[in-house]
Amino acid sequence: MADEVNENIFLVNAPAGSGKTTWIRQQVESYLLRNPKDNILCITYTNRAAEELGRDLEQSRVYFGTIHSFINDFIGSFFSHKEIIDLYWEVYETQIIERIKNTEQKETWTEGAERYKEKYGSLDLDTVRSNINKISYNETPFNSLLYGGLGHNDLITFTKLAVDRFPIIKKKISDKYQ
């Protein structure tokens, strides 16, 4: 059911009803007792699993959540830094220009452009650039690039780029959860 991938890093993969929650909870409780100054990061596949694992546990030293919620809650605080926004533009500027031009005349892009113009007065690269002051998680499969919003897959991809480019993010995670 559980394989130790690295020291103190486990991959738990088993079918429903096999005792995953019980096993993880026991491991967390045991670790917290043995290591009273440490914190635990426990990434789950679903929000429901995170809620179930966290039930009846003192959670000030344990983070239960999906990878998306962890990025949003912990790493998301970095997503308003100028360097991160610059990276966003480096990665997504071409796609943003495509959305603005909408040469393929995609109906959803046309509707989105109209909403953007209503909100900000115009839709051009300078306006979009001046309005994105934080990168955020949309909690959907789709990006909202004109607003700095990333969907499920791009949130993970972009976060990896940010962590690789800015080692301080990795250090903050290590300091808290290693």
Where do the protein language model's features map onto the residues?
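P-loop NTPase Walker
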Residues: 1-83
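Accessory N-terminal region flanking or inserted into the helicase ATPase core
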Residues: 1-13, 23, 104-178
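Charge-rich, low-complexity amphipathic helices
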Residues: 50, 75, 92-97, 177
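Residues that form generic nucleotide/phosphate-binding pockets
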Residues: 56, 70-74, 99, 103, ...
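Conserved phosphoryl-transfer catalytic core
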Residues: 82-110
